[in-house]
């Protein structure tokens, strides 16, 4: 059974219908429809991945927010998803407010930072030993932990395993030093166009070619492009960048905007392990991630 280990924080996700054209003044006015779930970007990816392929063992290393862990374990329907927690019980947990646009796309409004993740680093060191893939998001990386995480990444990458990191819209809260250290020990990067623009600006780079040149360990870059689908850029190590592009899927309901990066990344991880067929995997990722715009994702419903 192939093992995927992820490093991520559980959160209470509060999804609300929100008019982004009108600045929020009073939260009460905006709570037309409120949906609370146990979330966190990395957890969502892990949960979907475990549901999609029962032959994979998926492990989430996370802080022991007892209420959220209990809620998540109670509703989990897959035996191949394991929550590995630190020993210390934590009663306070982070909350994310997510705005829901009329077209089904979601956008982060605000989120609480990680409280303390020092014990989580030690947990990750143990669980990652026999993993095929290590996955996390820049949501989980900060100025306190990036050096320790990069050290773990370097050991994993030295054994020929895959390290995938997802970009996030709050990337600019990090220093360019921390971003560079993480990318220097990463093999796969995923994110949307806006997140890549933020990253390129912070690093003073002009495009994908510059990223591959500065970070030779990066083999593949996935870019979600909204209504234009998604692209995969492959570094063939011969001063040539290969590109695979998949257009957005159009249905009678709504145009697929590849709106859910959590699902997109789960499909990419499964493809990396099972098929190695980059084009087929990208096609599936575009299709699956677009389902959130056609009525949501059943696995996050209580």
Residue map of PLM features:
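Conserved phosphate-binding/catalytic loop of the ribokinase/pfkB sugar-kinase fold
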Residues: 87-88, 98-144
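Conserved phosphate-binding/catalytic region of the ribokinase-like
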Residues: 3-5, 206-302
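Glycine-rich phosphate/adenosyl-contacting loop at the front of the ribokinase-like
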Residues: 1-59, 68-71, 254
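Conserved phosphate/ATP/ADP-binding segment of small-molecule kinases
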Residues: 150-153, 157-162, 168-243
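Structural motif
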Residues: 3-5, 107, 132-135, 188, ...
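Short, conserved phosphate/pyrophosphate- and ester-handling motifs at nucleotide-, phospho-/glycolipid
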Residues: 49, 192, 261
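A glycine-rich beta-to-alpha transition motif near the start of alpha/beta enzyme domains, typified by
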Residues: 32, 57-84, 91
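Short beta-strand scaffold segments in enzyme catalytic cores
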Residues: 95-99, 107, 229-233
């Amino acid at each position: 059974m192939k093992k995927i280990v992820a490093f991520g924080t559980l959160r209470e996700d509060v999804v609300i219908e929100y008019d982004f054209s009108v600045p929020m003044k009073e939260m009460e006015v905006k709570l037309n429809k409120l949906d609370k779930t146990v979330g966190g970007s990395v957890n969502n990816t892990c949960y979907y991945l475990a549901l999609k392929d029962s032959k994979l063992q998926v492990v989430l290393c996370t802080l022991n927010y007892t209420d959220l862990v209990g809620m998540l374990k109670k509703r989990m329907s897959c035996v191949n998803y394991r929550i590995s927690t630190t020993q210390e019980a934590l009663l306070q947990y982070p909350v994310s407010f997510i705005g829901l646009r009329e077209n089904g796309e979601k956008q982060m409004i605000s989120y609480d930072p990680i409280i303390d993740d020092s014990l989580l680093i030690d947990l990750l060191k143990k669980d990652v030993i026999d993993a095929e893939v290590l996955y996390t998001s820049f949501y989980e990386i900060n100025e306190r932990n990036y050096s320790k995480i990069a050290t773990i990444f370097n050991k994993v990458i030295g054994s020929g395993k895959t390290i995938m990191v997802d970009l996030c819209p709050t990337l600019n809260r990090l220093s360019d030093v921390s971003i560079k250290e993480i990318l220097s020990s990463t093999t796969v990067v995923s994110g949307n166009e806006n997140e890549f623009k933020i990253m390129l600006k912070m690093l003073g780079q002009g495009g994908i070619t510059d990223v591959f040149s500065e970070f030779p360990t990066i083999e593949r870059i996935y870019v979600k492009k909204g209504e234009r689908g998604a692209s995969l850029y492959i570094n063939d190590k011969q001063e040539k960048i290969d590109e695979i592009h998949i257009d957005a899927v159009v249905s009678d309901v709504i145009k697929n905007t590849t709106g859910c990066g959590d699902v997109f990344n789960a499909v990419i991880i499964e493809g990396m392990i099972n098929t190695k067929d980059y084009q087929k995997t990208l096609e599936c990722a575009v299709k699956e991630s677009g389902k959130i715009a056609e009525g949501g994702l059943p696995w996050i419903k209580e």
